[in-house]
Each structure stands twice: as C-alpha cells, then as structure tokens.
Amino acid sequence: MHRLTRDDIEQAASLVYQVMPATAQYAWPLLAERLACSVWVKHENHTPTGAFKVRGGITFMHWLKRMHPEVKGIVSATRGNHGQSVALAARALGLRALIVVPQGNSPEKNNAMRGFGGEVVEHGRDFDEAREEAARLAQLHGLYLVPPFHTELVKGVATYALELFSAAPDLDTVYVPIGCGSGICGVIAARDALGLKTE
C-alpha cells in the first residue's frame, strides 16, 4: 500500500459526502472526569450502515468502476459491516452485490445486507470457508472479488480520521478497534498525512 496523502483522503471524502455527511465527534466530559483526561468519541454509528466501513465501500466501488468499467457485480465474504458497506455502495452504482457469510451468521446482519441490496449466501463454518466460496463464485459468475483489505477501502476509512483530527488536532492517543485492519490503517494514514504525532 502506498502512503496516502491528504489530497488522496480529501478526494475520497468528496465521494463519501455524496452519500452521507461527516459524522460528529464529541468530547465526553463525564468520561473525561473519570479518566482524568480529555476524551473525544467519533460517532461512526451515525453512518447509513451504523459503521465506519461504509466509507471504504463507497471509495472502493468508485475505484472499481473507474478501473474496471466492464464489471457488472461484486462478491465478497464478511460477517456483517463490510458486507453492508459494499452492498450499499454497489447498489448506488448499479452493480450486483453477492455477499457470502458463514452459516449461522447474525440474522440481523444478514437482513441489513439484504436491505442495502446485497444477495446473501450462507456457506461454510467460518469466515475462511465463506471467503473460499466467494472466490469460487467470483470465477463462476464473472464477479469482481472484493477483498476484506485494500488500499481503496483504507482511503475511504481514512476520511473519518481526517474529520476527527480536523476537529481535535491535539489528541495524544487514538484507540481504534481492529478486525482486518482498515480502521487503524486509515487513522495512521490520516495522522501521517496531517503530520501529527498522535499515537
């Protein structure tokens, strides 16, 4: 992955803001009092899917349509938020979205993916088996296989960190939940692009 610039992230933000507004970040005084430091919370639960990953889905699908205009649809494996993200973004661009989840996946997540236009296929005991099936279906149906981690996903995710650092540039530390790593990579990319020293 190449180092993202501020311009890269701002261009990604312009795509994201066609679908959703920036999300809020608030200082939480009671939590700050308890921890004896200033605390800011970035409210990515206020996105259309309720998670930051929607930003990466938007930028990835725009990249895909630019780089592979012949693509008619995508397939990806997920347990939820990534699937909602790519389903929403694919539908907005007129692409089919086939989402493979492990058997026994959360019915709420599956229904949310369907609600955003995804065709949900349950396969396998875990994410790895679902991912293998997604690769097979990509070949079978001529769909583009969307990976769980990609530079374009990170570029979109970095937009939430750009918003946070623009609102609160003097943060000492940012805590980020980690799954496949797009969230933490997006925060690091935005921090570095802005020349900040935040840990």
Regions found by a protein language model. Name each.
Residues 1-199:
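PLP-dependent amino-acid enzyme catalytic core
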